[in-house]
């Protein structure tokens, strides 16, 4: 079977990502209220949200390595199977403590989905098209993140708590079937570097690019932090301004839509060079947008700021992902993107913990200030990136 390299061949991959994200994002507008109705404090809420990422921190790298050895598709299918079963567990949960177990299982399933999906896409994208490929991946992810909360918020407001969870299970099953029927396991040669040394002698990161790898990973850590803030604190922040669950869904729509559109555009720009400039500018825009949130007092202002935040992520993320691919081993790509996604999930762990602890101590505005400081620190770190003129590993 020939290796597929055109963007059209990746359409089923992007569609599977879109459907999977659409499912789990349905509950975003009301999840904090759902958890706190079961007796959780803000701090407990932070732990419940964070355990999802914490499990991924522990499992993404070994699962990525396993996919390098056993094949990507079967691992991906196992992960997607959890997306169709676990949503039903939330309906019958009767305590906040039980959610820790459910979220932990969800994190294990997600470890078998996101890094493997990224590796499958990079396997089949030409070196000169990696920025565009990752831009489309992120666009699929964030366009679903834009629509899911709006749909979920409307279902919650009009049909009650259970409806979004049932739809999540249905969408998880649909993504599973799509991968099973439409996505093929890539040939081994499509993920190997021609006549390369064995894995034992092959460096994971090209010499001289370790700091660059760290800085690029910090970019997706920031994306995870933003996701953690949104999932933990956005509904409370919005409630303080008098917004309902549907309004929160609209904010997600603007944020996710902006992120998706700019991922496509700036993913193409990243393939033309200047990845470092895109990464720095995107992180700076995100920091400025976050810093202005305490000044917002209406729906229009809030949505504009979240659009700016989405634009910043859309500029920085595909460039960082492409630069990672350019400077790391192709034959160990599952492991590479396991590490890369572990950085993102570090943000998903850190974000809710910071949000919960600072909200209990200083309120929602205290959380926003803490997130702004973290965004500034990551922006400064991106100045250390060393740009590669050509892919070190194809």
What are the residue ranges of the model-derived segments?
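Structural signature of the two symmetry-related core transmembrane helices
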Residues: 74-88, 277-291
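Helix-to-loop junctions at the C-terminal end of transmembrane segments
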Residues: 60-71, 262-274, 359
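Helix-breaking motifs and short loop linkers at transmembrane-helix boundaries and internal kinks
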Residues: 39, 71, 92-97, 109, ...
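Paired small-residue
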Residues: 86, 97-105, 289, 300-308
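Core transmembrane helices of Major Facilitator Superfamily
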Residues: 24, 105-117, 308-320
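Cytoplasmic helix-loop-helix junction between adjacent transmembrane helices
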Residues: 102-141
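Juxtamembrane intracellular "pre-TM" segments in multi-pass secondary transporters
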Residues: 1-7, 184-216
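C-terminal membrane-cytosol helix-exit motif in multi-pass small-molecule transporters
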Residues: 170-192, 381-386
């Amino acid at each position: 079977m020939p290796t597929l390299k055109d963007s059209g061949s990746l359409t089923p991959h992007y569609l599977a990502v879109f459907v999977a994200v659409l499912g789990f994002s349905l509950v975003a507008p009301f999840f904090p209220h759902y958890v706190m109705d079961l007796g959780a404090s803000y701090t407990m809420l932070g732990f419940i949200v964070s355990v999802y990422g914490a499990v991924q921190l522990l499992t993404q790298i070994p699962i990525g390595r396993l996919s390098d050895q056993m094949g990507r598709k079967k691992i991906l299918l196992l992960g997607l199977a959890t997306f169709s079963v676990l949503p039903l567990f939330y309906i019958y949960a009767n305590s906040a403590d039980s959610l820790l177990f459910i979220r932990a299982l969800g994190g294990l399933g997600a470890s078998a989905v996101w890094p493997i999906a990224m590796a499958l896409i990079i396997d089949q994208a030409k070196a000169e098209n990696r920025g565009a490929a990752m831009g489309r991946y992120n666009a699929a992810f964030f366009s679903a993140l834009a629509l899911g909360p709006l749909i979920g918020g409307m279902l919650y407001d009009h049909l009650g708590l259970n409806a979004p969870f049932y739809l999540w299970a249905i969408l998880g099953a649909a993504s599973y079937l799509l991968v099973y029927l439409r996505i093929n396991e890539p040939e081994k040669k499509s993920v190997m570097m021609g006549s390369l040394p064995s894995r034992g002698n092959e460096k994971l990161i090209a010499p001289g690019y370790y700091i660059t790898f760290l800085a690029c990973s910090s970019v997706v850590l920031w994306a995870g932090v933003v996701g953690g803030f949104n999932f933990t604190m956005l509904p409370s922040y919005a409630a303080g301004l008098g917004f309902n669950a549907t309004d929160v869904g609209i904010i997600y729509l603007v944020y996710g839509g902006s992120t998706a559109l700019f991922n496509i555009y700036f993913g193409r720009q990243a393939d033309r060079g200047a990845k470092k400039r895109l990464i720095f500018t995107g992180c700076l825009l995100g920091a400025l947008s976050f810093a202005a949130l305490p000044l917002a007092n209406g729906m229009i202002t809030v949505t504009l700021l979240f659009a700016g935040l989405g634009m910043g992520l859309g500029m920085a993320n595909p460039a960082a992902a492409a630069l990672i691919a350019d400077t790391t081993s192709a034959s160990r790509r599952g492991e590479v993107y396991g590490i890369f996604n572990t950085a993102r999930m570090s943000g998903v762990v850190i974000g809710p913990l910071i949000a919960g602890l600072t909200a209990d101590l200083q309120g929602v505005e205290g959380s926003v200030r803490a997130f702004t400081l973290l965004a500034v620190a990551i922006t400064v770190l991106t100045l250390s990136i060393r740009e590669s003129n050509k892919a070190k590993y194809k």
